[in-house]
Amino acid sequence: HLINIKTVAERRENMLWFRAPEKIYIKKGCLPVALDELKNVMGKKRAFIVTDSFLYQNGYTKPITDKLDEMGIVHTTFFNVEPDPTLASAKEGAAQMTAFQPDTIIALGGGSAMDAAKIMWVLYEHPEADFMDMAMRFIDIRKRVYTFPKMGEKAYFIAVPTSAGTGSEVTPFAVITDEKSGVKYPLADYELLPDMAIIDTDFHMSAPKGLTAASGIDAVTHAVEAYAAMLATDYTDGLAKQALQTIFEYLPRAYENGQTDVEAREKMANAATMAGMAFANAFLGVCHSMAHKLGAFHHLPHGVANALMIEEVLRFNAAEAPAKMGTFSQYDHPHTLARYAEIADCLNLGGNTDEEKLENLIKAINELKAKVGIKDTIKDYGIDEKAFLDNLDEMTEQAFDDQCTGANPRYPLMSEIKQMYLNAYYGKHFVEAEMPAKEIEGNVKADAVKAVYNKGKKSNRA
């Protein structure tokens, strides 16, 4: 007789972690004191500054170069970073680094400058490294097929943010665009974590309203996604909730009176960095996956792209019985709706049930977006309807393959990502019964989209 023996894998509980830069300096005017360490503690001699042309031409690098001159540290500046940094510009900067041979790299700017500088750092220290290997997706950052090269053997990395949003100054991530394919790749490894972050709001005071708004809402999505992510812990939860409380209170002030309201700027800078530390360890989700591709295909600022997708993702993730969960979560049953309700509670938004609290959270986020001038839909930003629909399938596929998708608490189907994009374009919100999305051809109007969905829903019930 044959014995039918079935084997079931038992999941092991992995060690958790919390990683952050070795040194984080915070306070308006702290830059000169922080940079003192380069000479007095580390004995550094050559610094390479990475920034964009706007910041360079408007004197943002001067406080840094003045301090370096005072300490006798030789320096040069690369200022050709684009708003969406490309692999080509990173290679150009790395070539200049190789010629200059710095022992210190100082990234000054928003996420674009800091991300580009991280890629330059890798290419400078390890020119043999293969970019596509580094961009390879993984399930667990601690158990990768590809081992990231050891960083810091040639240069010490310092990040100085000039806006309150990306959190790149404290994260192990860098987003770079392959200019040949147009694909935006998020790289992730703790070797990319800066050695020092300097959060000096002297660099934030003159940020324009549009940047303040987009960056601030970006920080909101960082904190919300980190709180609901599969790798969230007690350590990241506190940072995420504190960041959200601070942003909801101070972002409108920073937006309206940013050039004079020092307290609002400082609070926002700290909140963005705290949200960065939260998602550096808990990771993000499908909102960022879709925002990466929406920005790459239609040239929307990253924070705006996140703002346009966040409501759809909140509704999608809140399903109590999802068809497919994310992989290797730190919990044993779906509880994302309850997590969103906890965020609503920490913001004192009210509600008697978790469902009511979710609606109040969505309403509060939408009200915050309205206060800082964020529009309601993708279409409102002038994205041509035919161009959007023509690119929709490719954008959907790339979002599905994005590294951030793997940490989302609910694993999406491509059809679900596609419908969320359509909802965000037309301002029609996610309804569970309307999944999966039906194929839509040509230049259609919102009513036609609704008719196709309703027809599909009826046929599914039949």
Predicted regions and their residues:
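C-terminal segments
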Residues: 1-14
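ATP/NTP phosphate-donor binding region
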Residues: 15-104, 378-379
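Short glycine/serine/threonine-rich phosphate/pyrophosphate-binding segments
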Residues: 31-34, 57-60, 87, 112-117, ...
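Glycine/threonine-rich beta-strand-loop-alpha-helix active-site module
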Residues: 88-202
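Carboxylate- and glycine-rich phosphate/diphosphate-binding segment that chelates Mg2+/Mn2+
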Residues: 170-282
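Gly/Pro-rich interdomain helix-loop hinge
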Residues: 297, 304-387, 430-431, 435-438, ...
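Short, amphipathic C-terminal "tail helix"
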Residues: 387-462
